[in-house]
């Protein structure tokens, strides 16, 4: 990547886009079904943390989609020339709950664009901050990290990460399936082909199977975190997480956690025992 290319991308820092949405019932009901939860309507229902991803959805027309299924990079998102895109992690700070029926405003801002070099070549890291408000009351601030990378240089995407075993106090096991990923893609109007198109994911992008969405992995973590909060008599304030490697369908994964001198830590072990996601959690009393 040329120096001028990066300088042109940095001109997008500070870009702002605003959205509004009404927190209606169907996405909550459907997400409950996806996670095998019973859903019972009640007035002033609190939307679980992480489920804000079911709202404020982009709706690009078919002719606006790129070869990978993502919307072509124009407008708010910088036109990064690197072809591959992945959700790399983020931070969420929860100030006040989102309630069923609320009218919410979302303000998104390009915070940073950074060039790095990794084992696959050039990487562009894009940081976007999303702030959510009910009228003037701040409810949630999310910092989203997206990584763009070059085309694969071999037939398969490989990682040097080795399986490890850690002590844990909390655990929940999930078995992501193609049906689950299809449902989550539909719920979030996500057309990224690595999540549902097996030939594309394996032959074009070099993955071993279709890839579990980064936000869905974070949702699995939040599911366990909220159970821990109830047991410990605490309230979730923030979650910071990083996706280390892709997670694929075709094997059970373990969400695990522990509280030690450094605080509450959670992680996801993929079906091979590798730490696919690492997270830190802050609770309040």
Report residues per predicted region:
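Hydrophobic, proline/glycine-rich low-complexity stretches
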Residues: 1-103
């Amino acid at each position: 990547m040329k120096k001028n290319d990066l300088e042109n991308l940095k001109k997008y820092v500070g870009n702002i886009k605003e959205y509004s949405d009404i927190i209606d019932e169907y996405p909550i009901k459907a997400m409950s079904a996806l996670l095998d939860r019973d859903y019972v309507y009640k007035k002033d229902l609190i939307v679980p943390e992480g489920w804000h991803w079911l709202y404020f959805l982009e709706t690009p027309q078919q002719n606006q989609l790129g070869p990978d299924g993502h919307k072509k990079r124009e407008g708010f998102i910088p036109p990064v020339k690197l072809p591959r895109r992945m959700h790399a992690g983020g931070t969420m700070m929860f100030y006040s709950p989102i309630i069923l029926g609320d009218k919410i405003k979302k303000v998104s801002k390009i915070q940073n664009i950074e060039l790095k070099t990794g084992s696959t070549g050039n990487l562009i890291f894009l940081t976007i901050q999303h702030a959510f408000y009910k009228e003037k009351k701040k409810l949630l601030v999310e910092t989203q990290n997206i990584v763009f990378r070059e085309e694969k240089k071999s037939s398969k995407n490989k990682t040097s990460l080795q399986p490890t075993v850690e002590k844990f106090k909390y655990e929940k096991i999930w078995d992501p399936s193609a049906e689950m990923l299809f449902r989550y893609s539909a719920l979030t109007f996500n057309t990224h082909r690595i999540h549902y198109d097996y030939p594309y994911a394996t032959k074009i992008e070099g993955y071993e199977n279709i890839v579990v969405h980064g936000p869905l992995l974070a949702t699995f973590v939040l599911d366990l975190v909220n159970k821990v909060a109830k047991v410990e008599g605490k309230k979730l304030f923030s979650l910071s997480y990083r996706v280390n490697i892709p997670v694929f369908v075709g094997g059970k994964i373990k969400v695990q956690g522990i509280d030690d001198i450094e605080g509450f830590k959670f992680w996801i072990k993929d079906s091979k025992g590798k730490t696919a996601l690492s997270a830190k959690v802050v609770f309040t009393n």
